[in-house]
């Protein structure tokens, strides 16, 4: 018997290896590889609830619920294993199956893993037992869903939403929900005191290490660093070492994003920590900038004006102010001569751009937008740090801030998407405000659509369930540190590009833009409604509510000029009256995170982004797996497959007739980035935290610094909070192609193949680190005293040799300024 099992194991492994490498060209091979991986793992997972409890009972925080309802749970799990929902899960492809077994399924005694069925049972059981434990939470759920009465009906409510994947949870929740003494918070933010060597030691070894040990992504404010005279690069390397230690051999790698304001005297050294040519770079962490509005105004209006730099110990209250108060303090310090250096603001901007193009970061956030749109006044205690993915915004000086995340799988909200009966709201039961809203979006499907429309009712049901899931996570996920009472929630989405494509639209078509706003307005409205119900019945109102803007009838969209509402203002007014009367359980609601992990499980596109590619690869903990665009292949005609495979699924490379047929599957790099920025602005009034808004540039566009700089300015002008999460560059030469397209290569004349060398397709060659000591050092000296005796810029005449400090060709542009060497450089 053992020999038979061994032979079967070897055969399955060989078949999987042969099929998984065809995933980007053959969707059936991808599905079959995933199903075979589930079959391969069948002997190493739990099969019955009794076996599951025997293996994992010592790990549960509430074993009683599972023991009490063992037979009923067995019935539910067995029925799920025979259902269309389970069939869809195991048919989601190889990468989906790999993510389950590699990351999410809990491992017990002797290496035994929970099965996919028991994984969802654990998540739903945690939510159900927590809901039953807190009488107020259960009362709120019964007010929202009056048909729910028994404990098992509470379980069914969560189980069917989770297994139908309308609600997708964060990685910490999927890995640890129901496990005793686990941290379920997704994000941690801290702005520690870094003014002395002792403070830095405490922050790193007493606090940061603990957060990383609990597998949380961390955002750290480091603007206060450097007051002890030490270089910021030393601090960054210490943080990087922490991250690398905790990630060694770890299933779920974690990281840190360090945030600084650009007036800091060591801003250039901070940027250099991520440059690839820096031999002391910090690859394990990310950098971010909280940029004041003044910086963008000066760059746009007077780009060669000076930007002054300050030692943080002489910077007064700059770190704690924003807006006009910041500007007054900045110019007061300049007038008082408190600055320690100055630099052309354009040179600093292009240093930021240079770093973004080469390293993908720094993340860039607009300080005024982040603080001015917060639910309370932050003047004098302004936040200047975000989380790891730049979408969670909370003050984190006085105490550590946390946030619990979940997201809605938007393709499951299409009218024709199969759902369990309990996941659909009855027309006559539930929250009267939600029942007053339309069930369907008024936008009509386009030509070639396979969807019959978008169900706003399903979206609201999913959002309501996600709000209850996060409430369970907050109430029972131990510990959530000092910020548990703030009950910060971040609901995001995945699969927005899939929805647009299935409805027959390109990502930036007018119907897409209309539905884009409608989706997030309904999510924000539903989250507020549900949070108010939970607050009323649990009698847990977040601290500071009475002093918050919400207590005065405010909504986040009030601060955004020209906001068009699809929900009638009269219904918004009724919600406002309810909130003023009953309060809110949560202090924050919508945060659009990247969702890259859970989107691999569902097989949908990431977050709210356009398709990244129709054929790509994804590096997991154990291997580099192919990731096909499943929506794309659902729409591809059989007679077009060969042509599409020859170009790796790139629509822009197809002949015109074929290109027109598949235009809605253009990638993010094919779209005008200003259109994508505008769509982020359209949904911004309903995103009370922020959105991980990335920019997608082709290599030839990224070679001109003005391209990215202009996009950053445009995002500032539109008032986005996160101006840029990540800068992604599409290489002109695709080095990621894993299958040789011999026939395609033969069809191209040899002289055309050799027309451009790989070197000609690269970005400008980076300078050697030794050549650049940083503009701060230059500006501290007089003319002709920079590195190598070169000059410093002044007035409108800019020495081209100075520009060569940053680039050897067009990375910095003259924009019409005189290009000649000055006397000290000739």
Curated annotation (Swiss-Prot):
The record marks 725-726 as: Important for electron transfer. It is an enzyme of class 1 (oxidoreductase). The lineage of its organism: Viruses, Duplodnaviria, Heunggongvirae, Peploviricota, Herviviricetes. This is Ribonucleoside-diphosphate reductase large subunit. InterPro entries: HSV_RIR1 (IPR034717), NrdE_NrdA_C (IPR013346), RNR_lg_C (IPR000788), RNR_lsu_N (IPR013509), Rrm1 (IPR039718). Its EC number is 1.17.4.1. Keywords: ATP-binding, Disulfide bond, DNA replication, Early protein, Nucleotide-binding, Oxidoreductase, Viral latency, Viral reactivation from latency. One of its GO terms (biological process) is deoxyribonucleotide biosynthetic process. GO terms for molecular function: ATP binding; ribonucleoside-diphosphate reductase activity, thioredoxin disulfide as acceptor. Belongs to the ribonucleoside diphosphate reductase large chain family. Ribonucleoside-diphosphate reductase holoenzyme provides the precursors necessary for viral DNA synthesis. Allows virus growth in non-dividing cells, as well as reactivation from latency in infected hosts. Catalyzes the biosynthesis of deoxyribonucleotides from the corresponding ribonucleotides. The active site is at residues 387, 389, 391. Disulfide bonds join 187-403. The record marks 822, 825 as: Interacts with thioredoxin/glutaredoxin. It comes from Epstein-Barr virus (strain GD1) (HHV-4). Heterotetramer composed of a homodimer of the large subunit (R1) and a homodimer of the small subunit (R2). Larger multisubunit protein complex are also active, composed of (R1)n(R2)n. Substrate binds at residues 171, 186-187, 217, 387-391, 594-598. Pfam families: Ribonuc_red_lgC, Ribonuc_red_lgN.
